[in-house]
Curated annotation (Swiss-Prot):
Pfam families: CSN8_PSD8_EIF3K
Organismal lineage: Eukaryota, Fungi, Dikarya, Ascomycota, Pezizomycotina
Name of this protein: Eukaryotic translation initiation factor 3 subunit K
Primary role: Component of the eukaryotic translation initiation factor 3 (eIF-3) complex, which is involved in protein synthesis of a specialized repertoire of mRNAs and, together with other initiation factors, stimulates binding of mRNA and methionyl-tRNAi to the 40S ribosome. The eIF-3 complex specifically targets and initiates translation of a subset of mRNAs involved in cell proliferation.
Family matches, as PANTHER family: EUKARYOTIC TRANSLATION INITIATION FACTOR 3 SUBUNIT 11, EUKARYOTIC TRANSLATION INITIATION FACTOR 3 SUBUNIT K
Origin species: Neosartorya fischeri (strain ATCC 1020 / DSM 3700 / CBS 544.65 / FGSC A1164 / JCM 1740 / NRRL 181 / WB 181) (Aspergillus fischerianus)
UniProt record, GO biological process: formation of cytoplasmic translation initiation complex; regulation of translational initiation
Record's GO cellular component terms: eukaryotic 43S preinitiation complex; eukaryotic 48S preinitiation complex; eukaryotic translation initiation factor 3 complex
Length: 249
């Protein structure tokens, strides 16, 4: 059973009190939420509900918006893909920051903040579409990306784990070279350590197609046939025939 959207096991009591009271609409609480974002970045936690509350305050009070806090929230949202977290956060930002053309093109092009938002949106698209090798290539292609993820402790490791989770849902066996690219692990030793210690998977070096990584069977990657049957009672045909005569009349 999934966790409720507005719940977070690591949420401090004072943040929970704000979210469940009228103070969540008080502009003075923005500094409290901003400090909480810093805490999430340092402690590798993510509280989507609290972050959305802060972005909503920014929406109502644009003069309070802190670009660095916003980019940190979006960067943290990347570490919990696949989920609607990034899209929900993005939807609360000003229209000129959105990753599509706007009427105010000049303003969009001249803003470092807007460029940062659009670069993060690009990373989100690559992750959500399972273009993992392209994600790492893009992330490593520009120093701005390094600056954007610098405040988020363990960003690469967190994303790597999420990618591994998705791979585990779709594969029972995968070529080691492919997985190296998807996880951006640039040596076979690093890959073997990650998949065995973090994922508890197996490495088979004696396969006919080279080294492969074997994923244990789970409810997502297990191949099984599904037979569906529907029972149609006689009374259902009676209703259909009766309606046909009623419409004709």
């Amino acid at each position: 059973m999934g966790v409720a959207f507005d719940k977070c096991d690591t949420r401090p009591a004072h943040i929970d009190a704000i979210l469940n009271g009228l103070d969540r609409y008080n502009p003075e609480t923005t500094t409290v939420f901003q400090d909480y974002v810093v805490q999430q970045c340092e402690e590798r936690t993510f509280d989507c509900y609290a972050n959305l509350a802060l972005l909503k305050l920014y929406q109502f009070n644009p003069h309070l918006l802190q670009p660095e806090t916003v980019t940190n929230i979006l960067t943290k949202a990347l570490t919990v893909f696949p989920s609607p977290a990034f899209s929900l956060c993005l939807a609360l930002l000003p229209a000129h920051t959105q990753p599509f053309p706007t009427a105010d093109t000049d303003a969009s092009q001249s803003s470092d903040f807007v460029e940062s938002i659009q670069k993060l949106a690009r990373l989100s698209t690559l992750l959500e579409s399972a273009q993992y090798a392209q994600f790492w290539s893009t992330l490593n292609s520009d120093d701005l990306y390094a600056d954007l993820v610098a405040d988020v402790a363990g960003f690469e490791e967190l994303v790597r784990i999420r990618i591994a989770i998705e791979v585990g849902k779709a594969f029972r066996e995968i070529n080691a070279e492919v997985l190296e690219q998807w996880l951006d692990l640039r040596s076979r030793e690093a890959l073997e350590k990650f998949v065995t210690e973090v994922c508890s998977w197996e490495v088979d070096k004696a396969g006919p197609n080279g080294t492969v990584v074997k994923v244990p069977t789970n409810k997502e990657n297990e191949a099984r046939s599904e037979v569906k049957s529907e029972r149609v009672g006689v009374e259902m045909f009676g209703r259909v025939i009766r309606r046909g005569f009623e419409q004709a009349a």
